[in-house]
């Protein structure tokens, strides 16, 4: 049985992890976040999604948690921005040129408010509900004075092969991590969820060994490697399961919520911790 007594912070991925099969936050989650906060355990959403999208998901409890967004490029602690890593325009130009060599790749770049689709919108329709807010169709990269905080590539086929090819070509600039069914997350080298979480830990004075983390995809790899209590989803990628200390149920079974409930109950605060607002 898992020992929860030393946990001081919980970091959780969103898609394929905390969200249900309809890409929604199960309602019980909000009471669990309140209960964790009441027990002195900080909850952190750690996702490839942008901060504005994450905050909307957690609006009822957003002021009682922290956010590592855009795969570590946006870090918010106690409601304040503590770090933002902007992509180099020159590096993006190299990536865009490479993506254009492959018919099965379609690139999206994001600033704080918009999603810039650098291909025919029809290429993205299959997962158009996957964090593409305020879409703007462009035929080239936005201007260099646009602060790009996130980059994703939609892949029609051979996702793992394409991630390998992109890495071979541009490994000095980026890290490429397969995510979801057909996406490849593009991260600046040296920037990932783990680097973002490290900033949150420093702000709260928490050690990595006192962190529980949940994830399912390769963009969760570094953080699961780092923490004391790593939990891979039953629906997660094989490599993520291999390096995690535990494998729990699937997101469709609300397995994360069950684990959060167990943490709350381990603090002997029972149902009294579950506030309602």
Language-model segment annotations:
Residues 2-9, 26, 186-277:
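Mg2+-dependent phosphoryl-transfer enzymes with acidic/Ser/Thr/Gly-rich catalytic loops
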Residues 6-22:
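Asp-based phosphoryl-transfer active-site loop
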Residues 22-124:
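Active-site phosphate-binding/coordination module
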Residues 35, 97-98, 166-168, 239:
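Alpha-helical scaffold elements within enzyme catalytic domains, especially in hydrolases
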Residues 38-44, 63-65, 149-150, 209-210, ...:
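Short active-site oxyanion
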Residues 60-63, 71, 169-172, 226-227, ...:
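Short, structured coil segments at secondary-structure junctions
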Residues 103-214, 218-226, 235:
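Conserved acidic, metal-coordinating active-site core of Asp-based
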């Amino acid at each position: 049985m898992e020992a929860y007594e030393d946990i001081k912070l919980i970091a959780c991925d969103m898609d394929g992890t905390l969200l249900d099969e309809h890409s929604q936050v199960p309602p019980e989650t909000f009471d669990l976040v309140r209960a964790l906060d009441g027990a002195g355990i900080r909850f952190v959403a750690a996702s490839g999604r942008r901060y504005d999208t994450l905050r909307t998901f957690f609006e009822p409890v957003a002021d009682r948690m922290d956010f590592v967004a855009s795969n570590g490029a946006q870090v918010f602690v106690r409601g304040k921005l503590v770090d933002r890593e902007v992509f180099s325009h020159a590096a993006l130009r190299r990536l865009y040129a490479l993506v254009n060599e492959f018919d099965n790749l379609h690139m999206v770049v994001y600033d704080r408010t918009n999603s810039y689709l650098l291909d025919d919108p029809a290429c993205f329709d299959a997962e158009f509900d996957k964090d593409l807010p305020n879409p703007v169709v462009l035929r080239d990269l936005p201007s260099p004075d646009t602060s790009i905080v996130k980059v994703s590539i939609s892949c029609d086929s051979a996702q793992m092969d394409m991630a390998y090819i992109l890495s071979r070509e541009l490994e000095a600039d980026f890290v490429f991590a397969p995510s979801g069914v057909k996406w490849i997350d593009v991260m600046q080298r040296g920037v990932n969820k783990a680097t973002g979480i490290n900033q949150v830990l420093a702000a709260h004075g928490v050690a990595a060994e006192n962190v529980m983390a949940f994830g399912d995809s390769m963009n969760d790899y570094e953080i699961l490697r780092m923490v004391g209590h790593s939990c891979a989803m039953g629906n997660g990628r094989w490599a993520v399961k291999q390096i995690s200390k535990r494998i729990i149920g699937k997101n469709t079974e609300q397995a994360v919520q069950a684990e959060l409930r167990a943490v709350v109950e381990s603090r002997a605060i029972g149902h009294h911790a579950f506030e309602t607002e």
